[in-house]
Amino acid sequence: MIENMKQDMIVILDLGSHENTVVARAVRALGVYSEIHPHDITAEELKALPNVKGIIINGGPNNVVDGVAIDVLPEIYEAGFPVMAAGHDKALCEVKLAQFGNDEEAIKAAIKSFVFDTCKAEANWNMKNFVADQVELIRQQVGDKKVLLALSGGVDSSVLAALLLKAIGDNLYCVHVNHGLMRKGESENVVEVFRNQLCANLIYVDATDRFLGLLEGVADPEQKRKIIGGEFIRVFEEEARKLDGIDFLGQGTIYPDIAESGTKTAKVVKSHHNVGGLPEDLQFELVEPLKQLFKDEVRACGVELGLPHEMVYRQPFPGPGLGVRCLGAITRDRLEALREADAILREEFAAAGLDKTVWQYFTVVPDFKSVGVRNNERSYDWPVIIRAVNTIDAMTATIEQIEWPVLMKITDRILAEIPTVNRVCYDLSPKPNATIEWE
């Protein structure tokens, strides 16, 4: 919840539907703020939320989670808010989406009518208002104290840094940890943009050998994530202890992080890797101004803040970096092959204009070799897998249909320029069933 928010809000009550974010985004697309809350919220809790104009109950016809039937509390219908049912037929609801079947246009029209005609909500949710509100809230929370931020250079942390810089200026201290799992030229670019262009207080730490040493021989994806996350915290802790007067920690949590990390009616998809787990004697109050934004809204926020296009639309990059794209136990030769293949892919996508139309694209190197032929001799080298997906909110994703000549040029370059690779494949798996990342 955005504290003291001034915008009208539609509340989505979660009955275990996997389409909660779809409904939430449909409302936000109308310029009205929406939030997902658990099905067992009380009428008192609901009324305590700011500027609620209506409720959408979202769930399937059976409403069963882990074998237990669930429903909203009866008092919700008497709380004084208009109620719409999505995904099933509720007798006490003013509007029922079930009557429209799979007619998407009719469903959108019904949601629009419910939001504006029934709930009388005002379309005042936009990034200009969001930035103004958050700058005010950050200043109220932080005052004249200092904020520490782990700056990866990705979209989320970059937008967060820009927002914090706007709110508190020189009281923001950024730490960039190069764990050796960055893309080619990534750390150098972070230093150039944030230290030299945005004039942020930036501390750069090269911890490549520390991370790769700890990851040697570790094949399990979740264990790799935990090692990377744990060591990151230790490095971050070391740098934090060198600074005096830090009271707050900036964290780039966004809404999909919250949704995918598990709620009362949702399962954990994978461990997320924002900063956490600092020791008890080094605890900070969190500053998380982006936590209610979907990914496209984070980008829109970056545009509103005046960040460069290449920064706002930088490719999404996981916290563990190439560590979850170098499958299995990480080795330096595969990591280098992966880094070079990724650079080639990004260069060719930019040349073809695909960097402006494809949401995320990257390469993966698995931990097995394939038989091939190089210089008229048998070779036994690594394959490279290309993945390119489009999505709005990272909750679902479709495969980008890349033109054959572009794929062939990428393949030719990878095979010619990386001597340890002899095969290139294209991943055709959407989300679901596959996640966007391989690990």
Residue ranges and their predicted role:
Residues Q251-T253:
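Extended catalytic-interface subdomain
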